[in-house]
A protein has these predicted regions:
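Short, well-structured alpha-helical patches and their helix-loop capping segments
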Residues: 126-128, 171, 175
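Outer-membrane beta-barrel porins/channels
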Residues: 132, 145-147, 152-170, 180
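Gram-negative (and chloroplast) outer-membrane scaffold detector with strong preference
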Residues: 54-147
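Membrane-embedded beta-strand positions in outer-membrane beta-barrel channels/transporters
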Residues: 24, 45-49, 87-91, 131-133, ...
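Short glycine/proline- and aromatic-enriched beta-strand/turn motifs that initiate or cap beta-hairpins
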Residues: 18-79, 184
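Outer-membrane beta-barrel "beta-signal"
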Residues: 173-187
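First exposed extracellular module after export/assembly in secreted or surface-exposed proteins
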Residues: 28, 144, 175-177
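Cleavable N-terminal export/targeting peptides
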Residues: 1-24
Length: 187
């Protein structure tokens, strides 16, 4: 009974706050090719994007996978595994003018923070950096549904810990080129 009451209270609170603020939330698919000192496969990710009217930022939280991911241990042994990670981005759009009718374009700047770990549990990665983003969006159903595509450039400062970083925090500067497509439902 207590769980049902808590769930009912949370639903009522969410409904009340949705009526006060316009919120856009929806799924996003990411494909992030990378330019790095060594050959690295692109990052694939599934994200949830969000925009709140009272905050001038577009947010996304993503689960990413890089597979296969290869590195060489300090003893020279090659290892092939996968990298799994979580990423948060926040972008400020400077413009979102109409091209024609439902079709708009946008550009802006933002930032990202990413944490990855190898599937074999031997490595941990921490990255952060700025990003520049541009894209197009379309609004349907009186602004209820937003479809968007975007492209970004995202240089990151990355620290590797564990076998891949010789256990001491090897520093790298990969440059990602994230491409995203997604939907936002506005309520």
């Amino acid at each position: 009974m207590k769980k049902k009451l808590t769930a009912l209270f949370a639903a009522a609170l969410l409904s009340a706050s949705a009526g006060v603020f316009a919120t856009g939330v929806g799924p996003q698919l990411n494909f992030d090719p990378v330019a790095a000192p060594r050959i690295t496969p692109p990052v694939w990710g599934l994200a949830c994007s969000a925009k709140f009217d009272d905050i001038p930022l577009y947010f996304a939280g993503a689960f990413n996978i890089i597979a296969p991911y290869a590195y060489v241990k300090s003893d020279g042994t090659p290892v092939v595994t996968a990298r799994l990670g979580f990423q948060l981005t926040a972008d400020y759009w400077f413009m979102n003018p109409e091209i024609i009718g439902l079709w708009h374009w946008f550009w802006g700047l933002g930032g990202t923070i990413r944490t990855d770990f190898s599937a074999n549990g031997k490595n941990f990665y921490l990255s952060t950096g700025p990003r520049a983003v541009a894209g197009m969006n379309w609004f349907f159903a009186d602004g209820f549904l937003e479809l968007y595509v975007q492209q970004a450039i995202q240089p990151e400062l990355q620290f590797a810990f564990g076998e891949d970083g010789s256990a001491n925090g090897v520093f790298g500067v990969p440059v990602y080129f994230p491409s995203s497509v997604g939907l936002r439902f506005w309520f």
